[in-house]
């Protein structure tokens, strides 16, 4: 494991750290170290690596696109969708990465602010003999986002976005929330003040924050931090020679990873 904290090199995404000693513009307190949840997990070599879930409310279905760590002939994926303990839909199919699987949901209940209904999703990977290789618990929300003219629509209905600008800073920990309750409390306070969501400003938020947003019906705009490229260095009084190709490549890979990680959260309605 190699970690490089290169704030001034111009090739590493900065978050929103200032390249100067003091905060300036939209660049704030510098931070270092591991600032989000990190863990080691033993996984099955033939288990489920990830699964994208695409809701389609117009056809009343959830579309699953699984990906596996490796493929073995005879392995099968079992998907079960339930609501309040009642099974809504299920299927079984040979394991194959990247192949969409459609599951029709009877009498679908939509996810929306005020009524954030979530479906429980259970995955199993079994070999040809029926042995359980992997088991994953997840959830999904049925919702649709689109724009008509200058209006935003959620589930085919116009919604006014009354959003706060959430910086994701904490008195204790700077970028790191002291506890799960602190993440939840930010959403609760915003909703009590009459807001229905937040623009998550220049920060890839903790996954647990998105979990609470999903559970509480809180709309969010996911946003990538400062690219770290030196477009405005002279105005900030810092002079750097920047490899823009390397910088853009780093930004592109980091941004793709962030979107991929948070793709399934129904509370995220836009990326900026």
Placement of each model-derived feature along the sequence:
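Active-site groove signature of glycoside hydrolases
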Residues: 254-272
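Catalytic cores of large soluble enzymes that bind and process phosphate-bearing ligands
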Residues: 26, 30, 243, 247-250, ...
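Short glycine/proline-centered loop/turn elements that form peptide/ligand docking sites
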Residues: 208, 224-231
């Amino acid at each position: 494991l190699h970690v490089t904290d290169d704030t001034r090199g111009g090739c590493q995404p900065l978050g929103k750290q200032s390249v100067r000693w003091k905060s300036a513009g939209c660049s704030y307190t510098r931070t270092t170290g591991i600032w989000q949840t990190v863990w080691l997990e033993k996984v099955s070599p033939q288990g489920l690596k990830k699964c994208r879930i695409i809701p389609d409310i117009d056809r009343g279905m959830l579309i699953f696109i699984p990906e596996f760590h490796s493929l073995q002939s005879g392995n099968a994926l079992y998907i079960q969708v339930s609501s309040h303990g009642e099974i809504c839909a299920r299927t079984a199919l040979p394991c194959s990465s990247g192949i969409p699987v459609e599951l029709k949901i009877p009498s679908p209940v939509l996810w929306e602010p005020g009524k954030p209904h979530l479906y429980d999703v259970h995955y199993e990977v079994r070999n040809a003999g029926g042995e359980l290789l992997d088991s994953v618990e997840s959830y999904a929300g049925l919702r649709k986002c689109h724009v008509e003219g200058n209006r935003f629509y959620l589930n085919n209905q116009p919604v006014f976005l009354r959003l706060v600008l959430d910086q994701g800073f904490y008195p204790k920990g700077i970028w790191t929330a002291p506890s799960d309750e602190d993440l939840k409390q930010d959403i609760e306070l915003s909703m009590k003040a009459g807001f229905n969501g937040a623009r998550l400003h220049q920060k890839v938020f903790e996954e647990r924050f998105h979990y609470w947003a999903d559970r509480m019906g809180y709309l969010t705009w996911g946003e990538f931090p400062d690219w770290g490229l030196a477009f405005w260095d002279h105005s900030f009084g810092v002079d750097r020679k920047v490899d823009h190709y390397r910088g853009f490549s780093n930004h592109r890979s980091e941004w793709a990873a962030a979107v991929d990680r948070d793709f399934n959260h129904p509370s995220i309605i836009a990326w900026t």
